[in-house]
């Protein structure tokens, strides 16, 4: 009987330790990994509360993101538009691990820096890219992708 109690106690401590690890990773500040203009747009949308502190838990709920280089962002939680934030880099986008829909719209002359490896978006179901120079596109890890649209992107296949 003591052995069973000891085993259950150890299992519970392991679960508790794992929860602490998960919670601590959710509280990791990744603000320095984001493009400043992308941070400004996310702040204006009230997706983040502070541009100097972006916790993974702050952005984990975002499933639908639309970016324009002229720029406005919308998501399921808040459909407000931002004022002009000229985003030239997608640096930081890779931290949106819950994205199900992503739409990127440019003006045909745009070349975005830091094009992410889209295959890291495991939950992505819809990807639409319009008028952004995109020489290559890796979606090999997007097993849930059901809708892909790339228009006027100069994509090399």
List where the protein language model places each region.
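Sec-dependent N-terminal signal peptides
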Residues: 4-13
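Sterically constrained small-residue positions within well-ordered secondary structures
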Residues: 10, 56-58, 151
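Short intrinsically disordered, low-complexity coil segments enriched in acidic
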Residues: 40, 154-157
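A detector of tandem-repeat and repeat-rich interaction/domain scaffolds
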Residues: 139-140, 144-150, 157
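Leucine-rich repeat
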Residues: 88, 110-113, 115-118, 131-135, 138, 153, 156
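N-terminal capping/linker segments that flank leucine-rich repeat
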Residues: 14-108, 117-122, 126, 131, ...
């Amino acid at each position: 009987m003591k052995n069973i109690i000891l085993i259950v106690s150890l299992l519970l401590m392991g679960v508790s330790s794992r929860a602490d690890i998960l919670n601590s990773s959710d509280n990791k500040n990744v603000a320095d990994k984001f493009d400043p203009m992308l941070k400004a747009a996310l702040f204006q949308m009230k997706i983040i509360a502070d541009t100097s502190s972006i916790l993974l838990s702050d952005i984990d709920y975002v499933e639908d993101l639309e970016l324009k280089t002229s720029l406005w962002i919308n998501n399921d939680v808040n459909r407000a538009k931002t004022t002009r934030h000229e985003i030239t880099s997608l640096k930081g986008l890779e931290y949106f691990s819950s994205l199900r829909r992503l739409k990127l719209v440019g003006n045909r002359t745009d070349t975005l820096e830091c094009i992410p490896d889209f295959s890291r978006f495991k939950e992505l179901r819809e990807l639409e890219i319009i008028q952004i120079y995109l020489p290559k596109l890796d979606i090999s890890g997007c097993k849930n992708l059901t809708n892909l649209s790339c228009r006027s992107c100069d994509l090399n296949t």
